[in-house]
Amino acid sequence: STDGIILIAKNVGVNLTSVNMGVPKFEWHDIPISKKINTLKLPIEGHPTGTSIGNPHCTFFVEDFENIDLNKIGPEIENHPLFPERTNVQFAKILDPNRIRVRVWERGTGVTLASGSSSCAVAVAAIRNEFTQNKVTVDLDGGSVEVNWQSDGVWLTGPTAHSFSGTLTKDFLKYE
């Protein structure tokens, strides 16, 4: 969820789309976090970085990437008192200044293979911490995407595929 924000997308190749995910926010009240603190190094073991990409994210940068028990740690961080609306949780390993490996715990869902907003949040957190360049490849369990933080927002570029077809009725399209 991106809080009902309209996202701009464009085709940039065959089965490749870029989406402007918006301008990231870092102020404690925008994420939101329960108290006024520096969001670059949150006061949680591991000192994760807090970011909002229209939804809250908490990114840990770790070396021992594969041995993280997401099913145990994910819900603990998601429901931490610091996050009044709960949070998405990412564990990231910097592979080089242009590439990051990520595992995701999505709030309300659990372990997920991929997440666009999590990919953007991790990239932005890595850039804020001066670990990477503004344009990085994010490798997730479900595939890889490119994230490019520009002045007009964070651009997410990745593969697209047809997943379903259907017809929407006029009643479905009416807004209340």
Where are the regions a protein language model picked out?
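Active-site proximal loop and beta-alpha junction motif in alpha/beta enzyme cores
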Residues: 1-112, 124-176
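Short amphipathic alpha-helical face segments that pack within enzyme cores
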Residues: 117, 121-125
